[in-house]
Amino acid sequence: MEYTTLGSTGMEVSRICLGCMSFGSSDWREWVLDEDESREIIERAIDLGINFFDTANMYSAGESERVLGDVLADYDRDSQVVATKGYFQMDESDPNSGGLSRKAIEQELQNSLDRLGMDTVDLYQIHRWDDQTPIEETLRALDDAVRRGDTRYVGASSMWARQFAAALHESERSDLERFVTMQNHYNLVYREEEREMLPLCADEGVGVIPWSPLARGYLTRPHEDVDATTRGENEEYLYEHPYREGGGPEINERVAELAAEKGVTMAQIALAWLLHKEWVDAPIVGTTSVEHLEDAVEALSISLSEGDMAYLEEPYEPVRVSGHE
C-alpha cells in the first residue's frame, strides 16, 4: 500500500480510501451488503494496508456507520483514519436532524459517534452546502466540535467553488478551523471540477478525495453492459449523472482498449488515471466484493504514460454540472 499526506494536515492516509456506502442494509438500496458480507471486505481492506475509511450518517440510515464501527472495534483505533459526513435529514419527523445549523451538527455528529462506537472521528465532513444556514454558524459549530475532541479535522463535499472559497475565507477571517479536504465528484467521464474546484484546492492546500471514481460502475465494463448490474437495474440516481453524455461512450471504449492492451481491468485503468492526477490524494472506492477491492489496490502499481493519459482524456466534452444536489 502507498500512503500520502492528506492535504496540509500532516495525517497519513492510504492512497485508496474504502468507501462504505455499500455496507449496511439492503432495505436502503438493493445492492447494499449485510454486516457479515461487509465485515469480510473491511477486514480484507485492512489486510491490504488500507487505513482510510469514509462513511456518512445517511448511508443505510446509519447502519453503515454502525457496521464500520463494529468491525474496526476489533482493531487498533490509532491506526485507523475514520471519516463520516452529515447534512441530509435523518428523521422525517425532526427537521433539525438535517442541515448544518449548530443544533443539527451537534446532535448528528454525536449520533454518528454513538453508532461508530468512538469518542472521536478523524474527519467530519459537511455532505453538502446548506443554503438555509449562514456559513459562519456552520464553521463555528465545526470549530467547537474540534475543540471538544469530537473530530480532529473538518472537511466538505460537493458544492460550487465559489461557496467553498467563501467558507475558506470565513475560516481565515474569523480564525476558525478550516476545511482540510474536498470530497468531490470526479472521474474520467466527469471532469467539470477541473475548471475551478480542483485548482482552488491546489492553491489552498486542500486534500482531494473524489467520490464515484469509477462513475457508478460506468467505467468498469463496456458501456452497453452497464445496465445489466444490480445497481444499474435498481438505482435511478445512476442515470442522473451525465456519464453517457458528451464523450462518455468513447472514453469508456478507450478505457476498455487500454485495459486489454495492458492486461488489466477497466476499473484499474480508471483508478490509475485518477491516481496519476497530482491534485488527487485518495479516491474513495466503494465495492461489493473482495475481488474488486483487490483489483482497486492493484491499480496503484499501474503506470500510465503521458500518451496514455492524453488518449483517455482527449474525447472529453463539457457536460452539465452534477453532484451538488
Q: Where are the regions that the model predicts?
A:
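Active-site groove signature of glycoside hydrolases
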Residues: 113-132
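Conserved beta-strand positions
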Residues: 18, 55, 84, 123-126, ...
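Beta/alpha (TIM)-barrel catalytic core signal, keyed to glycine-rich beta->alpha loops juxtaposed to Asp/Glu
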Residues: 130-314
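Structural motif corresponding to the early beta-alpha repeats
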Residues: 75-100
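N-terminal binding-site loop/beta-alpha segment at the start of enzyme catalytic domains
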Residues: 1-80
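Acidic (Asp/Glu)-rich catalytic clusters
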Residues: 8, 71-79, 113-117, 146, ...
